Amino acid sequence: MQQSEEFNKFLVDLRVTDPRDDKKRIQTAKGGLLTDSYVWVLQNSEFCHWRDDQDQRLLWVKGNPGKGKTMLLCGIIDELEATRPQGKLLSYFFCQATDERLNTATAVLRGLIFMLLEQEPSLVSHVKKYDQAGKELFQDVNAWQAMSEIFTNMLHNSKLQGVYLLIDALDECSTDLKQLLHLIAETSRSTSAKWLVSSRNWLQIKEQLRTVAQRLSLEVNASSVSTAVDSYIMSKVLYLSKLKNYGDDTASKVRQYLSSNADGTFLWVALVCQELENTHRRKALQKIESFPPGLDAFYERMIQQINGEEDAELYRQILGLVATTYRPLSLTESTTLIEECHDLANDPESLRDIISIYGSFLTIHKDTIYFIHQSAKDFLLNKAYTAFDQILPSGIAYQHHIIFLRSLDVLSRTLRRNVYELRAPGSFIEDILLPDPDPLGPIKYSYIY
C-alpha cells in the first residue's frame, strides 16, 4: 500500500477515534491540565524505574475513582512527548465506558495502531489483510483476532523499539477486557514495548497483570496525591476568587473546607467548585458547608437538590436516557428521545441551558452530552441508592423499551423517499452535500440502534 489516497482511505477505515482529540476534550472538560497536579509522579521511584529500565516494560497505575488517574496520564503523555528520543514512537488511548466506540478491546487497538501509522506510515506493511477484506477487517466478528495479530507483528518491527504505549481507564473497557489484558501481559514479555496503563483497583486486572506489572498505587502514594490535590485547590480557589470577587476571609474558609474534606480526591474538589461558580459570593460559605465529603455523598446531595427544582422531572428523564444509551447523545438526538423535550426539537440550546444548570452529573462538549465522570454514572445505576429509582422508576429494560418506541415514532415521522433530494440515485456518499440542518441528524441514534 502506497502513501497515497489508498493509504488515506485505509486510515479513514481504521479510525474509530483520534486519541489526540480525546485527550484535548478530556483536558478541556476538566478545566485544563495543571502541572502541579501530576509533577510528583515524574520523581516517583516506580515511574522512573519503568521509564529508565529497559527490562521494566509494564507499569500499572491504580487508584480509586476521582483520584486523578486520567489527568496523571495526560501529564505523563506530555512529559514523554517532550523528552523521548528522536524516532521513539508514542501511542495512547482513553477508554470510556459510556461510549461503545471507546469501550472495546478492538477499539483500543485501532486507536493505538492509528496513532502509530500516523507517525510511521511504513508500518502499514503489517496490514496486508486489508487489501482483501477492506474496512470489514476492523469490524466483523473476527476483528479482535485480526487486530491483535497485526498489532503484535507491528511491535516486533525495529521501528517500534521501546515504543511507549499508554491506556487510560482499563476498567472502562467493557468488551473483551480479558483478551486485552492478556495481550498487554504477553507483549510486555515478548517485545521491547513499554506499557503504562491505569485503572481502578479491580481484582480482575490485578490477577492478569500480577506476574508482569510493576504497580504505582495512588493510595500508597497518598501523601503525594494529597499535596497535588492541595495545589489543585489553591488553583481553583484563586479562580473562584477572581470570578466571584471573594474577600480574603471567604477565600481562606473555602480553601480550608476543601482541604479538610477532599480526602485526596480531585473530582470532589472539582464538583464542589463547579457548584460554587453558580453561587452568589454572599452564600458561598453556607453553600460549601452543605457538601459532605465523599463522591457518593456528594452525588446524593445533588440528587436531593435537583428534586427541589422546577425542571426536576425533565432532568431525571435526561439522566435516565443518558445512563441507558449505548453512546453519548447529541443535544438534537436527545430532544427526539425524551417526551418532554419534543417541543425543544428546534431549540436544542434550551436543553443545553437545563443541563448546564444541573451540571454535577452531565457536561456538554461540542453539542454532545457526557457524564462528568464514570463514577457519576455508577452512582445513578447503583440500586443501593434512591437515585436509581428516581431516574429509572421502571428499570433499565423498560427504559430501553421506551427508547425503542420513541425511535420508531421519530423514524416514521422523519424518513421519506430521497430525504436528501439527490438528483442521481447512484451518487457516491463522498459527493453528497449534507443539507443544513441535516434532517437525519436528530434521528441518528435511532436508525443505528
Regions found by a protein language model. Name each.
Residues 436-449:
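Amphipathic alpha-helices of TPR/Sel1-like and other helical repeat/solenoid scaffolds
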